[in-house]
Amino acid sequence: MDIEMAKEPVNPTDTPDIEVTPGLCQPLRRRFRRFVTAKQLYECLRPVFHVTYIHGLTSFYISCDTKTGKKAIKKTIFGYINGIMHIAMFVFAYSLTIYNNCESVASYFFRSRITYFGDLMQIVSGFIGVTVIYLTAFVPNHRLERCLQKFHTMDVQLQTVGVKIMYSKVLRFSYMVLISMFLVNVLFTGGTFSVLYSSEVAPTMALHFTFLIQHTVIAIAIALFSCFTYLVEMRLVMVNKVLKNLAHQWDTRSLKAVNQKQRSLQCLDSFSMYTIVTKDPAEIIQESMEIHHLICEAAATANKYFTYQLLTIISIAFLIIVFDAYYVLETLLGKSKRESKFKTVEFVTFFSCQMILYLIAIISIVEGSNRAIKKSEKTGGIVHSLLNKTKSAEVKEKLQQFSMQLMHLKINFTAAGLFNIDRTLYFTISGALTTYLIILLQFTSNSPNNGYGNGSSCCETFNNMTNHTL
């Protein structure tokens, strides 16, 4: 083939200049990829445990071996000291708020006899709640470590049935949860105190600390619980995919191929890589049964660790939602005769935002638990579908054992055994909320001054009653 040469030389000024800076783009891309990719279990949970370690909720963090690159749990003396210091600072700050006339953010917005009781209840519940969260998160750290070890063991077994776990998905989920919780907390706290300062109200530093630490600790506890429920959900999805793939192979192949060696897994969407593993169906079911048993044990261990934290968070959230809904309804219905520096819009906005914040907390807990429970319920249907299709006596026996295991081992999350954490909790909370709101509204309408007035604070009233008795 002939190639024509250019008759006239090209003027260098007619061509555009192109700047190539590979040295700047590639390092940034590599750093970003390192930031959002993970190859190990501990590596994908590293951001969450760094946050819990800094805030004193755990005595360990995820360290990295510079020689091998492996991630592992590392306990330090500073972790124990840090946790004790956080608890001591929190107790001291809450004691100052009680000493400062039972100071709370809500008391600056609203003053009535019911709000005195509500403020006192919120202060006491916040003090007890955050203390319980710290103690139940800090003391039984061994349960958290045991749960992580179970996840590591089941991940090794999942690889034997052809599953390669995508830890980067968990890492990105943990980043998303932490960033969203952080943004919501910062926006709500900053907005609240900006409204107070704009109305020439100066809260004490103790109130700043208690208000911020209460929301921060609750947000971190919810983020950690969400990550663990996501780990449980992911592994249940993997087991279900393995069993579904086995059923699909039996549908597409002849019945004679059931007793032969066959491929256990082709592809598991975003949870695995393309892998080919030759195994007998009975072996696949046996290993899936063992993995399911480990998942149930890990979920039970996680529930033991989080159970009192969840009870505390849901109780605090319910109490705050009840009083916030009452304050907003009283104002919107025009029954309140409040004396406040704040406009009605600012008043309603603050209590509505606080109510929505704790509604988000309850929804995050319930939905994370509910997703894992729903995935576990699907396993039974898949096992019985395989049981109806198989003709092999050995495979049928394994499936019957798996069916018995599913009857006795079920995944559920409870709040100290008092109630289950699933979507039925929405109905329970809405019913209790309606009942308490009706009681508070009736109490206000039957009171002589509609429950409002200048009055003294809850602490002063208690002191006067004590002096009168003496």
Swiss-Prot record:
Topology Cytoplasmic: residue spans: 1-76, 141-175, 226-309, 368-423
GO cellular component: axon; dendrite; membrane; neuronal cell body; plasma membrane
Membrane topology reported for the UniProt record: Multi-pass membrane protein
Keyword Cell membrane: yes
Stretches in topological domain Extracellular: 98-119, 197-204, 331-346, 445-470
Localisation: Cell membrane
Main location as per UniProt: membrane
Domain of life, per lineage: Eukaryota
Tissue: Isoforms A and E have taste neuron-specific expression restricted to the labial palps, the internal taste organs in the pharynx, and the legs. In addition to expression in a large number of taste neurons, isoform A is also expressed in a few nonchemosensory neurons, including the campaniform sensilla of the wing, leg stretch receptors, and multiple dendritic neurons in the abdomen. Isoform B is the only receptor not expressed in gustatory receptor neurons in the labellum.
Glycosylation sites: N454, N464, N467
Signal peptide region: none
Membrane-crossing residue ranges in chain numbering: 77-97, 120-140, 176-196, 205-225, 310-330, 347-367, 424-444
InterPro entries: 7TM_chemorcpt (IPR013604)
UniProt keywords, alphabetically: Cell membrane, Glycoprotein, Membrane, Receptor, Transducer, Transmembrane, Transmembrane helix
One record GO biological process: thermosensory behavior
Pfam families according to UniProt: 7tm_7
MF annotations from Gene Ontology: ligand-gated monoatomic ion channel activity; taste receptor activity
Known role: Probable gustatory receptor which mediates acceptance or avoidance behavior, depending on its substrates. Atypical expression also suggests nongustatory roles in the nervous system and tissues involved in proprioception, hygroreception, and other sensory modalities. It is also possible that it has chemosensory roles in the detection of internal ligands.
Family: Belongs to the insect chemoreceptor superfamily. Gustatory receptor (GR) family. Gr66a subfamily.
Designated name of the protein: Putative gustatory receptor 28b
Native organism taxonomy: Eukaryota, Metazoa, Ecdysozoa, Arthropoda, Hexapoda
Encoding gene, per UniProt annotation: Gr28b
